[in-house]
A protein has these predicted regions:
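His-Asp-centered metal-binding catalytic motifs of divalent-metal-dependent phosphohydrolases/nucleases
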Residues: 70-93, 97, 101, 121-132
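Divalent metal-dependent phosphate-bond-processing catalytic cores, especially two-metal-ion Mg2+/Mn2+ enzymes
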Residues: 39-51, 55-66, 79, 131-224
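Generic N-terminal amphipathic, Lys/Arg-enriched alpha-helix
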Residues: 31-41
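An active-site-proximal "capping" alpha-helix that borders the catalytic cofactor pocket
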Residues: 53, 96-110
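Boundary at the C-terminal end of the N-terminal hydrophobic targeting segment
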Residues: 18-22
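Bacterial N-terminal signal peptides
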Residues: 4-16
């Protein structure tokens, strides 16, 4: 079933499979990189997370012998969480950061030299990057899977635990454990690409082992 879904996702945007690895005018990349480094400050979904997503998405696609449009992937990976940060954050208004990010990403890309014809593909990848959503097209698929896998394994633990409020606010220790348990239960089945699926068992095992050790060492989390 997952293989069928994978093929459908790719076939809906087959034209981009043969896209050039990147445009010759790549100066916009440094603009985007600097923008992300300056504005995205968060231990769980900040600049370093964007860098990891870009690299992992490329690695997964290469393992699956799928050619991506690297312009689209780079822009989407580095900017996919932009609406989780001020002044673009509208979560309090009930607007999901993925939807808002897709809507406003052109405000960063326009005027940088980024190929304007590719902005809609960037919007598409950003809109569906979260693991609960269904990506359409190769760049969207591999960004989606990279973003999902970044919630598992040791890095997934590090991201969630970094969110714990040191002053007793939320999330506290127990809430962080619940987030990790939810990720363990929900994320693995949402990784769709063949290469991504191959990485799931080890990362799943690492996260499960951490939770088991933590449970044992804190009397069932009661001493967190």
């Amino acid at each position: 079933m997952l293989r069928v879904a994978f093929l459908i996702i790719l076939s809906t945007a087959a034209g981009s499979l043969g896209a050039a690895v990147g445009s010759e005018q790549a100066g916009w990349r440094e603009v985007v990189r600097q923008f992300a480094a300056q504005h995205f400050k968060n231990p769980a979904w900040g600049y370093s997370h964007s860098v990891r997503d870009y690299k992992l998405a490329k690695d997964l696609a290469e393992a699956d012998h799928v050619t991506l449009d690297d312009d689209v992937l780079f822009a989407a990976a580095y900017l996919h969480d932009m609406a989780a940060f001020a002044p673009w954050d509208r979560e309090k208004e009930g607007v999901d950061h993925a939807d808002e990010g897709a809507r406003v990403v052109d405000t960063v890309l326009k005027g940088t030299g980024f190929p304007s014809a590719k902005i809609d593909a960037v919007r598409n990848a950003i809109r569906t990057h979260m693991f609960a959503r269904t990506p359409v097209g190769p760049e969207a698929l591999y960004l989606h899977d990279a973003d999902a896998l970044d919630w598992l394994g040791a890095i997934g633990v590090a991201r969630v635990m970094a969110l714990v409020d040191p002053n007793g606010g939320e999330p506290d220790g127990p809430k962080a454990v619940k987030m990790l348990e939810d990720n363990l239960a929900q994320v693995p089945s949402r990784v769709l690409s063949p290469a991504g699926r191959k990485r799931v068992p080890l990362l799943q095992q690492e996260l499960a082992a951490f939770l088991e050790d933590l449970r044992r060492e804190t009397d069932g989390y009661r001493m967190l």
